[in-house]
Amino acid sequence: MVYSYSEKKRIRKDFGKRPKVLDIPYLLSIQLDSFKKFTDQDPTGERGFEAAFRSVFPIKSFSGNSELQYVSYKLGEPVFDVKECQIRGITYAAPLRVKLRMVLYDREAAPGTVKDIKEQEVYMGDIPLMTNNGTFVINGTERVIVSQLHRSPGVFFDHDRGKTHSSGKVLYNARIIPYRGSWLDFEFDPKDALFVRIDRRRKLPASIMLRALDYSTQDILDLFFDRVNFKIKKDSLVMDLVPERLRGETASYDIKDSDGSILVEKGRRVTARHIRQLEKSKTTELEVPVDYIEGKIAGQDYIDPDTGEVLVSANAEITLEDLAKLSMAGIKEISTLYINDLDNGAYMSDTLRIDSTTNRLEALVEIYRMMRPGEPPTKDAAEGLFQNLFFSEERYDLSKVGRMKFNRRLSIGEDEGSGILSKEDIVAVMKNIITIRNGGDEVDDIDHLGNRRIRSVGEMAENQFRVGLVRVERAVRERLSLGDLNELMPQDLINAKPISAAVKEFFGSSQLSQFMDQNNPLSEVTHKRRISALGPGGLTRERAGFEVRDVHPTHYGRLCPIETPEGPNIGLINSLASFARTNSYGFLETPYRKVEDGVVTDQIDYLSAIEEGRYVIAQANIDIDKNGRLLEEQVACRHKGDSTFMRGTDIQYMDVSPQQIISVAASLIPFLEHDDANRALMGANMQRQAVPTLRADKPLVGTGIERIIAVDSGVVVVAKRGGSIDYVDASRIVVKVNESELRPGEAGIDIYNLTKYTRSNQNTCINQRPCCSVGDPVVVGDVLADGPSTDLGDLAFGQNMRIAFMPWNGYNFEDSILISERVAQEDRFTTIHIQELSCIARDTKLGSEEITADIPNVGESALSKLDESGIVYIGAEVKGGDILVGKVTPKGETQLTPEEKLLRAIFGEKASDVKDSSLRVPNSVKGTIIDVQVFTRDGVEKDKRAVEIEEMHIAQAKKDLTEEFKILEEGVYGRARNLLLNAGFEQAQLDAIPRSHLLVQTIDDEAKQTELEQLAEQHDELKADFDKKFEIKRRKITQGDDLAPGVLKIVKVYLAVKRTIQPGDKMAGRHGNKGVISKINPVEDMPYDENGNPIDIVLNPLGVPSRMNIGQILEVHMGAAAKGIGDQITAMLEEQRQLAEIRGYIKEVYELGDEVLQRVDIDSFTDDEVLRLAKNLKGGIPIATPAFDGAKEKEIKEMLALAKLPTSGQRTLYDGRTGNEFERKVTVGYMYMLKLNHLVDDKMHARSTGSYSLVTQQPLGGKAQFGGQRFGEMEVWALEAYGAAYTLQEMLTVKSDDVNGRTQMYKNIVDGNYQMQPGMPESFNVLLKEIRSLGINIELDQD
């Protein structure tokens, strides 16, 4: 493999043994592609805005004299960029403008004669735009729209599993689910009659539906039944014989063949042999006794030819009397329905008998009554309602997916078709459910991923946009019908508010629009790849059963079987598997390699769950030779959801990668194959809660996917084009682009501005640091700057800690963790948290609030950190209770005493009419002010601080743009200089020419002269562009802010808090091994090894066996080896060994392992590159052990041997307090530990006095409300059991809801009198009132 310059800085040794056939696709593509389809122009009109507009327009007036037509749309440019929107707290959105055409028809002339046409562009609201990282900025906060897994439109057949009826009989049902419109259900009742329901309302016999579709009784019988024909003889009947129909019957007469010989005697069962004999003898008719027809059902009406009387009506049972009547009337042939209890039930015939309707109108009226009970039906109303239910394109749409699923399920040829239902569709569904009831077909599995599809951002936004358009449509239609249309323009007809409201509601408050989890890069990526079954049109967690939540065989390679929440949402919220994608229909697909005749090809096909069922698929870890031929005789494979063994030649596909089945979070766990699934789930979930540490530390033992996640998440800065680093500082990187990658006539400079110390959604710190130096060569995709939780482009949200598994004085009881003081001193787990505190000055009824340093009754010391505007300085260190922004609020006028009046008369208006409402630092918070933002309403005078901040921003913007301009200008001059040198100018000559004159020189060569003129043009463009950009920036900075109504000014203060690790903080490994720090031990007391190196963290060995997460032990051993190799390299460097020796050792390390595919050609590295690599490996060689394809035990031992460590992975440790050797050897190594976002500082809380609940008068609960600790029922039992009567009394009275008692108690404590007088608890009064509300008079008898 060829490594770029930046990749050579640190190479991760990979133990993967399977070749990489397919790279993991871009992780955020599910979000970006979906939204792109929504916003991109689509000429076909099948999706996005185009589809929504075409479905609603043209809008015709009721009279038909005018219509509003859609022409085209365009999305404008957003006013502010993403960062500005976040700072200002506004939505990152672009205006949508639509060109509409209003057509007026001439009433007097021929129909369709156009009288007037008006075209105009109309504003239709702002549409939120997606950022490059797949998020939306809504009201200044980053949000993610989670994709939804919902039931695909189409037709589904199911049964009730025998739960509906007491007999336990299985009742089948069919449901046609459209994308939009009414649901249509068919179901059997316990008596085997077929019923229909519309939108889950009252059920009606299914034949009513057919009658409403204009089928007569005769048509219905013809549709659903075969016929048996009888010829009437004198004293017998001759039946047309279809031998197959006799199978399984007991003969009620002798069955003879055409020769008259008896094949089946009366009373014998007809077997398959008898049927073969009948077919062989070519018998077509069979004589049967007359009573055989009794009870059979007539297939049509039989009418007396003379009188016209109906002798036997269709669907009536035939009796012997009926037969005699028919015979007398001269009818020679009778047709009956073929009904057989085994495989041809009389369901439709029974349904017709319970149907009271006889014609179409009656059926329509019955449906109208069911849909609109209480309304009097008219013919037109009934017709209109039924027509609109399933046959109107405005009200009903199966969608492309629904039609495809419908046609495939009912084996109708093509996948295309109309979005509405036809008569034939409804009949086909009824026929199919009857076939299922007859045992001829299977019901569907609704948890199969072929029946559930993904609805992503774009689709949901389009649906919501369409909802807004439909609201507008009604209003437009009304306006077209009223008023003088000659005066109106399209703009006057359209009100954009309903559209904006619908879109805003979706992005702002939909269940699937979620506040982005921004703890670390992994949590961002996972949140964007989340698939939820909840949300509008989805499931609810209360109703979701076990089957929906369970892992289904079709999840393989599509949804991760490991990563899901642990609580009530388990199984309802899933994560996309690493290689999965959605197809054009919205179904999940996963890639497979094609196998032909036992040979694996390089062809890769993406298969959906439906397609996968047709193939035999082998796993990725099967043995193949170098030509791709399968080596095993019997290969483990999957077919139709079952695991089995088959011959190599029968295999049709194989997996592309062992990590195919798991999500990105699960594939970050090394040695995942050795962990129990439950613990792996916890490990995957807890990695998302890891807080970025102050100094990121790459994991020594990784899986090789760390770089992919870091790059795809967008937190690192990646080179867009190749070149070399021209300039680097903490906030900017400038790359001089390679000549080969230049676009014609550009300066060839790429500038990357870095994000510095900004706040994430979870209050963690986002900061980017350059990881390149001036002069470094760069290729496309190189990481130029690390973001939060990344180290040289690798994801790094924890620290490599030296671990020992041993008990230590009970301090690791029940998963507690003992850590060394050194860890805290070295700031290994120190994190920075940035809080945003806001102070809002409003316009109140009594006057305006004011932000000022002139605050009543506040001492000088409290104001020491404020400037003259009353706003805290940047850099000030503040603690709980300090004033950040001084604010005074007008008080209501109070009655003044004569003395006060006198004082006011003497001293004028005093500050007594305002109260202090300043913004203070919350209790228990201590930190540094890192930024202040002031937003002032338009028209309100800016204070001094706001002006200063503005000037600072303008100066910064000017500095940035000037530097950018200088760099670009230098690029232009540099190219001009080269051009002039090539044209024959001398270097000395060029040095004498002033820079500004370089571009106006004349050259004899015409082509070069043209090129120089182009450069001069480009320079002028750059200058104009600089002026324009600066003007835009200046205008943005100086313009007033659009604040909420009644708000005059907002001051936002950003407070950075440094949190070191401390007892009570939660930590975890990557294998679900979590615990809480119990003690921070002095370094000298920690166990140490024979070299005197102390242990950093002591974990409990009892936490491993029962949890079955053995992966952590292998990680510790491999970590020890990786660090040991780093120590060996460090020793070599310190001893200044020969570079050849160091090169040899590094080469040996990278070549270690069986069948390892990675090839690092260390010999091709220059000496400098080897030296830099060695320096970067001093802390340990990073290792990749991919999930299900990782390092084996033998390889770990080889690594330990190479690091000159005991291959057992255990060593002798000594007690730091006594110096004595511990009894037995201890497992010591390096584990990657994470600090989770469950910090004791955020949870620790104590209450003195505070607010109380209004009804019960008990203290509130929780830190946010400054609440008390709950003393619950079980705690009361505990005190009762101890007999602690006085403690119990004070708990239930003065410390809780005895209002008078607690007030008195407070006074007593203040006075130094420690006594209490308990009274009546308020909750007793609540109980009394509740009993009285039940109508029971209860009175308290107080003695």
Curated annotation (Swiss-Prot):
Disulfide bonds: none
Class in the EC hierarchy, top level: transferase
Keyword Iron: no
A GO term for molecular function: DNA binding
Sequence intervals crossing the membrane: none
Annotated catalysed reactions: RNA(n) + a ribonucleoside 5'-triphosphate = RNA(n+1) + diphosphate
Subunit annotation: The RNAP catalytic core consists of 2 alpha, 1 beta, 1 beta' and 1 omega subunit. When a sigma factor is associated with the core the holoenzyme is formed, which can initiate transcription.
UniProt xrefs under PANTHER family: DNA-DIRECTED RNA POLYMERASE I SUBUNIT 2
Family in the record: Belongs to the RNA polymerase beta chain family.
Task of the protein: DNA-dependent RNA polymerase catalyzes the transcription of DNA into RNA using the four ribonucleoside triphosphates as substrates.
UniProt-recorded name of the protein: DNA-directed RNA polymerase subunit beta
Annotated organism of origin: Shewanella violacea
This protein's encoding gene: rpoB
